């Protein structure tokens, strides 16, 4: 075999090995598992209002620490947000809702309803609550058809809170019942935060 032919053959083999290695590495990178996205949708409780250093201690941050690197947890909490579309601060009109849709969560934890106990909201729009809740779920499902829903019961209203004193404890109970009904209707999981 001549020297030139040997070098040509060796070059072809090296080129083949290089191409094979490059393709294998590219395929391996494509097989890298993407993290499971968890969208935490809610109000000030989700946001972390009142928590010292909320960027490190809000429940979505704590959830991220518990779940680890295989998950990506997004905090889409909006202080004062109502679930009701006709409420005083509808979640669906907030930037956080648009961000939650763009996030395309694989899991959506929804913790809304506490601000709907406001006298401006529940007495006037209670009949829209189930429909509005299911509509939010439908929007999140449109962003990711395989989304898994986890609905959170509302946290208690403190007995010193003005809404408790004003008699909205009954409304709180009615909303709690509605959330349980929504979980049953939709097949979503139901959890407590307390």
Regions found by a protein language model. Name each.
Residues 75-77, 153, 192-194:
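Residue-level recognition of beta-strand->loop/alpha-helix junctions
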Residues 157-194:
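Substrate-gating cap/lid alpha-helix
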